[in-house]
Amino acid sequence: MKVGIVGAGMVGSASAYALTMLGIASEIVLVDYNTDLAQAQAEDISHAVPFVSATLVRAGDYGDFAGAGVVIISAGVSQKRGETRLELLGRNAEVFRQVVDQVLAAAPNAILLIASNPVDIMTDIATRLSGLAPQRVIGSGTILDTARFRSLLGRYLEISPQSVHAYVLGEHGDSEVLAWSNAMVGAVPLMSFAKQAGKPVTDTVRSEIDAGVRHAADKIIKGKGATYYGIGAGLARIVKAIASDQRDVLSVSSVTAELAGVTNVAASVPRVIGSSGILMDLVPDLDETERIALAKSARMLKDLALSVPC
């Protein structure tokens, strides 16, 4: 599959690198307003190709997206000093208006994969601007938060995180909901596994893992300025599910007809991903506290999305 990437910064280039390492894409085209950056990133990544795959990695312009099955959008503007979140969203909506039009002019059949933050709102904006069915506009959502949740649980339980089945729902941000009540390890409920393994999940353990998930980005940004490897791998994982029609269950964002009593809101739940995009939404059974938290998260996202004209 040919993959286009808008934005050759840290996230865009990390996703291109992950796609190359995994051999998922036959061709990757990087587009950025800074053409020198796009060219340099493409050249650097292409030098890794002989070691791992046969992917063609190059820089180009929007017209070079022709025939792409997926286009990752990681473009956006940075927040100015004194600028409100709403003002920033308005400027990013304007960027997306230009980007989405040019992407679809070249690749009208592509699935859009949104990585720009705040990703849920930008997914909503991209859906409105594109006129595409929500199933074809996918935000990275809580795929990284879910990976962090599983990683921390696996580390505590001394089990492979790939055997941990637990999800983060709602916003990719402060109001996200860690779905503890239905977390599983293999075929065993989390609390049962923890008891059998002699690793009880106490309130203190839950609190530490919750904080570890919520504040992971802050810790990484403090140390190195940005996060990009994790989300780059997450984006590659979504593309893999599409390219191979794997029908995998991944926690991604999309405009949802109804979630926790809120209509037409972009938020994350587990979703089945295949060659045509989102095939099915899966809303897990939650306890009362989690249901209330998810409703609050969905309402906050809906209100914020409505405040952004596009």
From Swiss-Prot:
This is L-lactate dehydrogenase. GO terms for molecular function: L-lactate dehydrogenase activity. NCBIfam families: L-LDH-NAD. Allosterically activated by fructose 1,6-bisphosphate (FBP). Keywords: Allosteric enzyme, Cytoplasm, NAD, Oxidoreductase. The gene is ldh. Belongs to the LDH/MDH superfamily. LDH family. Its EC number is 1.1.1.27.
